[in-house]
Amino acid sequence: MAKAVTIKIKLVSTADTGFYYVSKKNSRTMTDKMVKRKYDPVARKHVEFKEAKIK
């Protein structure tokens, strides 16, 4: 069986609220860490979310 191309990642809030999103990414085309600006409902504003591994 072949190795999966897409992997699940956790996008953790940089506002240190502990809130995170789960997303998928193509590990072959996106080799660098993903950073997205999304809404954090705990902080109630848009902040950057950085990629972390799912444990």
UniProtKB/Swiss-Prot annotation:
Q: Name one GO biological process term.
A: translation
Disulfide bridges in this chain: none
The keyword Kinase belongs to this UniProt entry's keyword annotation: no
GO CC terms for this protein? cytosolic large ribosomal subunit
A Pfam family of this chain: Ribosomal_L33
Q: Supply one GO molecular-function term.
A: structural constituent of ribosome
Q: Which UniProt keywords apply?
A: Ribonucleoprotein, Ribosomal protein
| Domain of life per record | Bacteria
Q: Which HAMAP family match?
A: Ribosomal_bL33
Q: Which family does it belong to?
A: Belongs to the bacterial ribosomal protein bL33 family.
Protein name per Swiss-Prot or TrEMBL: Large ribosomal subunit protein bL33
